[in-house]
Amino acid sequence: MRSKERLSMSKINLYNDRFFEPDSKTRSVARELYSKIKNVPIVSPHGHVDPKILSENKYFSNPADLLIIPDHYIFRMLYSQGIDLESLGVPCANGIQIEKDPRKIWNIFCKNYFLFSGTPTKMWLDYVFKEVFEIEESPSEHNAMNVYDHIQNLLQKDNFKPRSIFDRFNIETLCTTAVSYTHLTLPTIYSV
């Protein structure tokens, strides 16, 4: 098992075949199939993106509000390791948000990023950090504020507004529902 210290300064490596079968015959078929469909527009039948984000198309306020607070995969993992939801900015059942400082929330996330090792969530986060935000090192308590500031600067640019990201990822249709800590609602379909 890799230690927290080794992970804290590790580079983000995205291996080209990370989602393909290790068996070489199967992998070659997977590569061929992927090469034929990789540029097809995305039709996403499931998601947790608040449709208001796309309809309003406002700048994201900060990295914590974008990546941590609305993502139940992230905050539930941290909660399972003893971190209070309130300290992560997740609103209470009555809608009140206890921790409102996004830098504190981000620091907790980065300090505990090593907990995501070996999970699909880390694979997704590593992709987002490296490919979307051009971050080379895994987030850690040592670089938390540098990573935060870097992302914060990008979030103030037009090409990081929700509709720009939607278009950049070639999303044609996104079916979504409310965030996981609200009452269940009917799905919303957002299409270009």
Task: Go through each PLM region and give its residues.
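A very general structural signal that marks isolated residues within well-ordered alpha-helical segments
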Residues: I53, T188-I189
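An N-terminal structural lobe/cap that precedes and organizes the functional/catalytic core
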Residues: S10-A93
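Conserved small/polar residues in nucleotide/adenosyl-binding loops
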Residues: T182-T188
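Alpha-helical scaffold segments that flank or form the walls of functional sites
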Residues: K38, P63-Y181
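Short, Lys/Arg-enriched N-terminal segments with co-localized hydrophobic residues
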Residues: M1-S8
